[in-house]
Each structure stands twice: as structure tokens, then as C-alpha cells.
Amino acid sequence: MKRLLITGAAGNLGKILREGLKGYADVLRLSDIAPMDPAGQGEEVVPCDLSDRSAVHELTKDCDGLIHLGGISVEAAFDDLLQANFLGTYNLYEGARKNGKPRILFASSNHAIGFHKRTTKLDDKSELRPDSLYGVTKC
């Protein structure tokens, strides 16, 4: 793989993947609106607000794969969640599609599936029952 994009690269999981995926692609393109360590060998650091459609279109250019971890990961005002998590995800998918690179790994949340009895077995067909406004944006 030539170039792999990781959004939310300044977050906990993003930092783990940044280290763990070194060498998997020729270049790891790392993006977040939060500060990150400078680019190392085989890395590009590209700050980007995912709610900015044209910036996201540029961000996804020349990427062979995308790992989407970006957005707000806690409960917040619904308008903020919509911009970061819903519109940001939409822009990322559209940027990838328009650039001919439709492969995206999307990290959702247990808050999208909501509360179930501990004994309930859940699978990909289980009903979504978001437990918060944050959960709604991760469905």
C-alpha cells in the first residue's frame, strides 16, 4: 500500500496505530485538529477539520486506504457532534469516493448499539439503540 490515511491520529487509538502500522504503507498520512508529534520517516502530518469538505477532499487524495477515528468521542452539544461526527464522516466518505479510493475502516462505538442485557448476543444485524446524542452520531 502506498499511502494510508489515519484520521484522529492524535487520539489514543490513533497514536497506537501510528506506531503499529509503521512500514505497512510507504507513507502514513496522519490527520487531526489536535496537535500531533512531528512527522517521522514515512509519515505525513496533515491537520484537517473534517467538517471542511474541500480540505477533506484534498486530504483523501492519493490515499489507498483510510482508517477513520476522527471526531468527538464524548457527549457534547448536538450541533458540535453533528459537525464533527456526522458531517465529518460524510465528507471523508465522499472525498474517498470522488478520489476513487472507497476502502475505509470506520470505528463506531458501543454507544451506537446501546444498552442490552449482558446475556444478549449481539451481531451486525442487532438493532441500533443509541444511548446518547454521541451514540446517534456513531450509528
Model-found features: residue ranges?
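Conserved Rossmann-fold NAD(P)-dependent oxidoreductase catalytic core, especially the SDR/UDP-sugar
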Residues: 91-133
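Rossmann-fold cofactor-recognition segment
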Residues: 40-52
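N-terminal Rossmann NAD(P)H-binding glycine-rich loop of SDR-like oxidoreductase domains
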Residues: 4-24
